[in-house]
Regions:
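Metal-dependent phosphoesterases centered on the DNase I-like endonuclease/exonuclease/phosphatase
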Residues: 114-194, 198
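Catalytic metal-binding/acid-base residues of hydrolase active sites
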Residues: 7-9, 33, 99-101, 138-141, ...
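N-terminal, active-site-proximal structural segment of metallo-dependent hydrolase catalytic domains
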Residues: 1-43, 55, 60-63
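Conserved beta strand-loop-helix elements of the APE1-like EEP
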Residues: 58-74, 90, 181, 186-209
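Structured beta-strand-rich core segments of catalytic domains in phosphoester-bond hydrolases
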Residues: 32-103
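Surface polyanion/phosphate-binding segment centered on an Asp-His-Pro turn
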Residues: 218-229
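Active-site-proximal beta-strand elements of phosphoester/diester hydrolases
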Residues: 1-10, 92-105, 135
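Short catalytic/ligand-binding loop motif for oxyanion handling, primarily in non-cytosolic enzymes
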Residues: 12-14, 35-38, 103-106, 141-145, ...
């Protein structure tokens, strides 16, 4: 089973079409438009969530999981209070797509590492029941600007995930230190000189393969991730 995570930056029709041509069984897509505007083929199902952004009166920026119809389902314990986290069961695997994002409404703005850790704690009881993949744009990196003493940065998020039995595929594969990655996944305002590692895939089981796509500047300010299980 092939899982691809790709923050596509702007939800343009040609980008969605390109995603679908990747042949993934499951797509985790931050910054995608709502289902009624995505116009997916009937062979696919899509779950979309997020605080609504409006652009020409349309919801255009949320998190989605897309999967082949009949080959997965959203769990009954999906909790929409976490605006940008979706749990999918596919072939008895738990695929938790996440995109920790600060709400645009009047709620207090939590730091990204806090949002990520709250999502992890919400779904952690199910990590023991399923072979689990947590994947997406974590919006977290080492020494980020909104770190706090309590919630830290990506190092703290990683500590919490490892305490639940999950490990970063990239860091397992490369044995590189967090914050010293040789491949980066996010290019702020499309500048290579201002880049970070903030897209992650964590599992509690061995996978067949993991890779980070080369950066496609036309597609996004992020790179995509591919996991085959």
């Amino acid at each position: 089973m092939k899982i691809v995570s790709y923050n596509i930056n702007d939800s343009l029709p040609w980008k969605i079409e390109k995603l679908l041509k990747m042949g993934a069984d499951v797509l985790v897509v931050p910054e995608i438009t709502c289902p009624e505007d995505a116009h997916l083929p009937e062979t696919l199902d899509m779950k979309w969530c997020g605080i609504e952004y409006f652009h020409h009166q349309k919801k255009w920026k949320g998190l989605s999981i897309i999967w082949k119809r009949g080959q997965g389902y959203i769990t009954e314990w999906f909790n929409p209070k976490h605006d940008y986290a979706i749990p999918l069961i596919a072939n008895d695997y738990l695929i938790l797509g996440i995109w920790p994002t600060k709400p645009t409404d009047d709620r207090p703005k939590k730091p990204y590492p806090q949002i990520a850790q709250e999502i992890i704690q919400e779904y952690a009881p199910y990590f023991k029941e399923y072979k689990t993949l947590v994947i997406g744009d974590f919006n977290c990196y080492v020494n980020q600007y909104d770190r706090t003493k309590k919630y830290g940065d990506m190092l703290k998020v990683n500590e919490v995930l490892e305490s639940k039995g999950l490990h970063s595929l990239y860091h397992q594969q490369t044995d590189e230190e967090f914050g010293k990655e040789s491949i980066l996944t996010y290019f702020h305002r499309f500048h290579e000189s201002d880049s970070y590692f903030r897209d992650y895939a964590y599992t509690n089981f061995p996978v067949i393969s993991f890779c980070i796509f080369p950066w496609d500047k036309e597609m996004s300010d992020h790179t995509g991730l591919e996991v085959i299980i």
